[in-house]
């Protein structure tokens, strides 16, 4: 019996805030980084680093790099700043996922790994909250 060619998977870690988007692709263990890019590598203005356009360009660059290394599919882990900060991902997250799929990569699972505090440090605004 002939051996079936092994389907190679990786994990795409997408960190998306309202200031930047960072995409890092690692092997399944997370030990080896295969490709890495951030908003500042594809756009000139700081204010555009978190934009969906920048995320699309980043995802295309990353997809090219990992396809060259023989990766055919990715599991996606989306992360927002979390903790005492914003718990919803920025505008670049969805564009990055869509762009990875459009680049011809198989999408496995998509999970949200935003850190959630279990009563950690005091939230900004102090004891009485933000008074407007």
From Swiss-Prot:
Gene Ontology MF terms: rRNA binding; structural constituent of ribosome
GO CC annotation: ribonucleoprotein complex; ribosome
Keyword S-adenosyl-L-methionine: no
UniProt-annotated stretches for the region Disordered: 113-132
Role this protein plays: Located on the platform of the 30S subunit.
Protein name listed in UniProt: Small ribosomal subunit protein uS11
Protein family per UniProt: Belongs to the universal ribosomal protein uS11 family.
Subunit annotation: Part of the 30S ribosomal subunit.
Record keywords: Ribonucleoprotein, Ribosomal protein, RNA-binding, rRNA-binding
Keyword Thylakoid among record annotations: no
GO biological process: translation
One Pfam entry name: Ribosomal_S11
């Amino acid at each position: 019996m002939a051996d079936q060619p092994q389907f190679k998977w990786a994990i795409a870690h997408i960190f998306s805030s309202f200031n930047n988007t960072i995409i890092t692709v690692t092997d399944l263990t997370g030990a080896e980084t295969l490709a890495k890019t951030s908003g500042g590598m594809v756009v000139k203005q700081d204010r555009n680093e978190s934009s969906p356009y920048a995320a699309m360009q980043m995802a295309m660059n990353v997809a090219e790099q990992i396809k060259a290394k023989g990766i055919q599919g990715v599991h996606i882990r989306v992360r927002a700043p979390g903790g005492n900060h914003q718990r919803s991902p920025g505008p670049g997250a969805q564009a990055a996922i869509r762009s990875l799929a459009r680049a011809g990569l198989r999408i496995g699972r998509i999970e949200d790994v935003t850190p959630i505090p279990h009563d950690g440090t005091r939230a900004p605004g102090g004891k009485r909250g933000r008074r407007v």
